[in-house]
Amino acid sequence: PHKSEVIDGSNVKIKMSPPKFCDKPVNVYGFKGRHVDSGAQHFVVPVDSFSKINALCLAKKIRYSKHFSPKGINVNFFKKIGSNSIQVLTYEKGVERIMLSCGSGSVASAFYASILTEIGSGVIIQVSGGSLSLDFDSDWKNVWLSGAAILLFNSSLLIEDLQ
């Protein structure tokens, strides 16, 4: 179970699972990346640039590749955009779309980015839904993700309506 804290009215932080690599770097359809377990399985690919349209097509192809068969995998693309900031796009299996935000995908991307680049704790992660901040210790055992929590949808269902 995750621990969480309300920072203020709309900002929260959540303790995330420590990330770990599941294999050596692999090349899938010409994209070299790493399989990271950050509480969910992600294939993380560093890129110099990307578009959401290309990311959607490529991620779907990677997600269904035989390398990750039969279960498939979530796919993340990240690029470094500042001295301690990255941009992340996450394609989530099951939903089969690029997500506005994904906590485990952001952690997986920052974990791999910390190996490849000089980002550190306090890294800012730009996702389609806004900005997140990730704090972690040197061995990635104490990992906290912070950002705005926004209600996107609210619904109710009466059981009687189903009969």
Report each predicted region and the residues it spans.
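Pepsin/retropepsin-fold aspartyl endopeptidases
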Residues: 9, 78, 161-163
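Anionic-ligand binding region
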Residues: 21-36, 43-78
